[in-house]
């Protein structure tokens, strides 16, 4: 397997050019394979993929450096390999080195640069150098994700902390006093018990004193002056509630069916 490859579109390749390629590739001259009249190969190079470390293309006509030939040079080069393209120096109106740089860039090469014109065998020529990427198609590498560290919270131990026990006073800690529940009987008809302490016995005594007597019925007397106007004007403790309106001093008489059921 050759360490370097030299191609040209001419019939022969100068020995000096082969020596320059060997020096650039850091190999001996015997390790350099030479292909002449590369245009006759139809753009195909009889080498395996990534098999040579450097390629020297001596091109007399820039049109010979076609896209297919550039792709083949890139195919046979190893990852990180270099390619050198030599062509006759351009005249003032022609710039073939610019076309070569563009073709190499379009072919996937990197670090494309042209050197100053040099003279070989009384012929001015320029050299365009380029490099194949150091990675190959299908290669992969893990991505290192940078994780942002959480900001550290500075806690000041000297800061004043509130004691929750100090928020309650002695009054708050005392057991609340429940309201006194009436100790009398409960039910539909509540009555004061014998030892009443809730005040129900006193209330019943006051109500008992308000019961109507025969004298009050025969000679009604109003303390507020509204008893004879009817229930709409009588107070809540009026003894005449339920009786029809009457005039002061008028005898109150009830019909015979007053206490009879309506049904």
From Swiss-Prot:
Short sequence motif named Cx2C motif 2, residue ranges: 235-238
InterPro entries associated with the record: Anamorsin, CIAPIN1, Methyltransf_11, SAM-dependent_MTases_sf
Chain segments carrying region Linker: 142-173
Domain of life, per lineage: Eukaryota
Region ranges (Fe-S binding site A): 184-198
Sequence motif Cx2C motif 1, location on chain: 224-227
Sites where the protein binds [4Fe-4S] cluster: 224, 227, 235, 238
An annotated GO cellular component: cytoplasm
Cofactor: [2Fe-2S] cluster; [4Fe-4S] cluster
Single GO BP term: iron-sulfur cluster assembly
One of the record's GO molecular function terms: 4 iron, 4 sulfur cluster binding
Gene3D superfamilies in the cross-refs: Vaccinia Virus protein VP39 (3.40.50.150)
Region (Fe-S binding site B) residue spans: 224-238
Binding site for [2Fe-2S] cluster: 184, 193, 196, 198
Major place of residence: cytoplasm
Entry's localization field: Cytoplasm; Mitochondrion intermembrane space
Keyword vocabulary terms for this entry: 2Fe-2S, 4Fe-4S, Cytoplasm, Iron, Iron-sulfur, Metal-binding, Mitochondrion
Region N-terminal SAM-like domain, residue ranges: 1-141
Biological role stated in the UniProt entry: Component of the cytosolic iron-sulfur (Fe-S) protein assembly (CIA) machinery. Required for the maturation of extramitochondrial Fe-S proteins. Part of an electron transfer chain functioning in an early step of cytosolic Fe-S biogenesis, facilitating the de novo assembly of a [4Fe-4S] cluster on the cytosolic Fe-S scaffold complex. Electrons are transferred from NADPH via a FAD- and FMN-containing diflavin oxidoreductase.
Subunit-structure text: Monomer.
Family to which the UniProt record says this protein belongs: Belongs to the anamorsin family.
Comment block on domains: The C-terminal domain binds 2 Fe-S clusters but is otherwise mostly in an intrinsically disordered conformation.
UniProt-recorded name of the protein: Anamorsin homolog
Organism for this UniProt entry: Zea mays
